Curated annotation (Swiss-Prot):
InterPro entries: GH43_arabinanases, Glyco_hydro_43, Glyco_hydro_43_endo_a_Ara-ase, Glyco_hydro_beta-prop_sf. Endo-1,5-alpha-L-arabinanase involved in degradation of pectin. Its preferred substrate is linear 1,5-alpha-L-arabinan. GO terms for cellular component: extracellular region. It catalyses: Endohydrolysis of (1->5)-alpha-arabinofuranosidic linkages in (1->5)-arabinans. This is Probable arabinan endo-1,5-alpha-L-arabinosidase A.
């Protein structure tokens, strides 16, 4: 057996042992960090937003691609007057009252001087986006949270913004009826009291009678210069509740506000550090977990991260990929 064939077989066996399917296929522009996915109502075209290039975005006829880069959502940066306004992170996309909303983060790495902003478009065409600045969800060193990693959730017409990264981890803020601004104060819905509180990137998805709170846990970035200890790299976890606003627990019954979280996807085979996830209902494939990851046969740099996706099986009551 050739060396390359041996590596391929070993990678497949590793994936089977851990029980994770390998990422679905991707063609075209597949380098991505913190992806966010939506289909346009008018024609079914897929749009994928990501960190970098003042919120880069691409389109495709399917989740597999071929993905074509369109450009930047906000080529002039954000109107929010904070450091990082020209380096926007972690987009989240939703359709609200017939208008496409892209929420984005303004911050710098390791800082709590952060804000969640909003850009809107009725078409998602290039150069059609209007920046509305801050949603009012902001943080400073006086806050228990970091106002980045936005995720809007629509619970039957009532909107909630999930957000947060490290510090006291994941918070939720009720939004106004237009989902343009926070309507009242935020509260904690997930927290790991141990270590550096390495929880971020929340994404909420309802399936059946449960609300599932997905999040990324561990160290996200810089793997090419400083590899984390084994198991401390990014992975995707989940808790669930019968309410959108709290009481989330993992499969063992541990509260998500006390370190709970059941692993959905972690490093396996040549897949390393999956995270920055979302969940998307594909008309052909059903529920899809999408994320970024490192292919260890290509490289560990942040700019080499790839778009991954797997079908989700909810038959056990918990997401399995």
């Amino acid at each position: 057996m050739s060396a390359s064939a041996f590596v391929a077989v070993a990678s497949c066996l590793a994936a089977l042992v851990h029980g994770y399917a390998n990422p679905g296929s991707c063609s075209g522009a597949c380098n991505v960090h913190d992806p966010a996915l939506i289909r346009r109502q008018s024609d079914g075209k897929y749009f994928r937003f990501s960190t970098g290039n003042k919120i880069s975005y691409a389109s495709s006829s399917s989740i597999q691609g071929p993905w074509t880069v369109l450009g930047s959502v906000l080529p002039s940066g954000s109107s929010i007057n904070l450091d990082g306004k020209d380096d926007l992170w972690a987009p989240d996309v939703s359709l609200v009252n017939g208008v496409y909303h892209v929420y984005y983060s303004v911050s710098t790495f390791g800082s709590q001087s952060s804000a969640i902003g909003l850009a809107t478009s009725s078409t998602m065409d290039l150069n059609s986006w209007t920046d509305h600045g801050s949603t009012g969800i902001q943080s400073s060193s006086s806050k228990p949270y970091n106002a980045i990693d936005a995720n809007l959730f629509n619970d039957g017409g009532t909107y909630y913004m999930n957000f947060g990264s490290f510090w006291h981890d994941i918070y939720q803020a009720p939004m106004n009826s237009a989902a343009t601004a926070a309507a009242s104060s935020s509260y904690n819905i997930a927290y790991n009291p141990s270590g550096t509180h390495a929880v971020e990137g929340a994404f909420m998805y309802k399936y059946g009678s449960y609300y599932y709170l997905f999040f990324s846990a561990g160290i996200c970035c810089g793997y090419d210069t400083s590899r984390p200890a084994s198991g401390e790299e990014y992975k995707i976890k989940v808790c669930r509740s019968t309410s959108a606003t709290g009481n989330f627990v993992d499969a063992s019954g541990v509260a998500c506000t006390n370190g709970g979280g059941t692993v959905v996807l972690e490093s396996h085979g040549t897949v390393y550090g999956p995270g920055g996830q979302g969940v998307f209902t594909d008309p052909s494939l059903g529920p899809i977990l999408y994320y970024h990851y490192v292919d260890t046969t290509i490289g560990y740099a942040d700019g080499q991260k790839l778009f991954g996706w797997n079908k989700i099986d909810f038959s056990s009551g918990w997401p399995v990929v």
